[in-house]
């Protein structure tokens, strides 16, 4: 076990560091003065022998300005595809006929909402008193044919964003990279923040072959003895392909994909989906990666 004493920073006396990572993201309590702090670190081996040392931490001043803290956020949740169609040219972005707003036949299809639509409605949201917009996942998504709740032969599309087929590209139905950047920039000019939903637990239906080809012969998707029915972390969720996040190579690739969006765009927050279905080490690694990119970045 590895612990650090954070009392000098207003934190816990026994902050636990994950031994698989040997690093951790820490917060400083409001009122702590800027400067360099020496934090005691204790390591216990399997025989309960203790080894102690110290690590230096630099605390810098934060100029809040007109910014607001997380506990002051007024959040509006928008399923982007269902919110407002601001650019009709992306409605059938993949040429697969997956756009259908007919109430009788299109409840499981795309309806046209996009980044451009959100941008056009920022004044409306601001007038409601909203200062944080939470949007559904932005990455490319799969479709699934014949879900149990559907009519036989119907198609259900990932308009909601939770059936990822590629974590490195935007869902074209939602718009272009430029339109996404415009949404972020426009929101920030109005003093608003954007929180993006992300998934690390699973992929979209029928994507096993694609993701299993990513690690040079090592599968990313759980199968066989690794797939345990009824297990919170190692069981399937709605029969979606389940990532073996406890494997360091799988974990690192997922963290790399999802943190890259924060490196590329000025995203303010992440809302993390299916938290209880993923091991704690993966969440710690994800937090560490995001903190390295932006120390003020928040995820819930």
Predicted region positions:
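Aromatic sugar-binding surface patches on proteins
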Residues: 18-26
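Exposed beta-strand face motif in extracellular beta-rich ectodomains
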Residues: 35-39
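Short, surface-exposed loop/turn segments at beta-strand-coil junctions that are enriched for proline
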Residues: 27-33
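Short, exposed coil/turn segments at beta-strand boundaries within extracellular/luminal domains
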Residues: 46-52
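Substrate-binding/active-site clefts of carbohydrate-active enzymes
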Residues: 69-73, 81-265, 283-298
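C-terminal edge beta-strand
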Residues: 53-66
């Amino acid at each position: 076990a590895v612990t650090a004493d954070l009392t000098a920073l207003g934190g816990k006396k026994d902050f636990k560091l994950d031994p698989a990572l040997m690093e951790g993201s820490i917060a400083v309590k409001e009122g702590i003065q800027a400067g360099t702090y020496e934090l005691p670190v204790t390591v216990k081996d399997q025989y309960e022998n203790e080894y102690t040392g110290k690590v230096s931490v630099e605390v810098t001043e934060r100029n809040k300005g007109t910014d607001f803290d997380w506990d002051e956020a007024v959040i509006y949740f928008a399923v982007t595809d269902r919110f407002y169609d601001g650019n009709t040219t992306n409605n059938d972005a993949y040429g697969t006929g997956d756009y259908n707003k007919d109430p009788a036949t299109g409840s499981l299809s795309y309806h046209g909402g996009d980044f451009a639509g959100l941008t056009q409605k920022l004044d409306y949201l601001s007038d409601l008193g909203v200062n944080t917009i939470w949007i559904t996942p932005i990455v490319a998504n799969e479709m699934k044919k014949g879900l149990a709740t559907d009519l036989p032969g119907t198609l259900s599309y990932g308009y909601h964003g939770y059936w990822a087929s590629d974590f490195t590209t935007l869902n074209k139905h939602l718009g272009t990279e430029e339109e996404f950047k415009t949404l972020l920039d426009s929101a920030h000019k109005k003093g608003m923040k954007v929180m993006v939903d992300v998934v690390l637990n699973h992929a979209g239906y029928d994507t096993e072959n694609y993701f299993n080809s990513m690690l040079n012969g090592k599968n990313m998707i759980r199968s066989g003895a690794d797939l345990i029915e009824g297990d919170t972390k190692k069981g399937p969720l709605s029969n979606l392909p389940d990532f073996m996040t406890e494997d360091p190579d799988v974990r690192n690739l997922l963290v790399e994909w999802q943190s890259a969006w924060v490196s590329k765009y000025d995203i303010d927050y992440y809302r993390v989906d299916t938290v209880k279905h993923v091991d704690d080490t993966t969440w710690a690694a994800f937090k560490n990666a995001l903190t390295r990119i932006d120390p003020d970045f928040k995820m819930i």
